[in-house]
Amino acid sequence: MEEVPFENAMQRLEEIVDLMNQPTTSLDASLALYEEADALMRICESRIRQVEQRVRELAEKRHESSLFEEQAVVR
């Protein structure tokens, strides 16, 4: 599955849940939907991990910067 924007993947996951909850959805269709949902969840989880890592990096830089500023004030 090609790279899908996070928001689009989440929207499609909601659609899949709705489709799977319909009593008219066949077993084979449910399986296909489940497989699609699995791929979309992997995309979302990967993107969340990327964002979390970037936030950690930014927080660490901010912390290092404030330590540097504190040391400069002490001198």
Swiss-Prot record:
Keywords: Cytoplasm, Exonuclease, Hydrolase, Nuclease. The keyword Nuclease applies. It comes from the Bacteria. Its EC number is 3.1.11.6. The keyword Nucleus does not apply. It is found in: Cytoplasm. One of its GO terms (cellular component) is exodeoxyribonuclease VII complex. Coiled coil: none annotated. PANTHER family: EXODEOXYRIBONUCLEASE 7 SMALL SUBUNIT (PTHR34137:SF1). Belongs to the XseB family. This is Exodeoxyribonuclease 7 small subunit. It comes from Chlamydia pneumoniae.
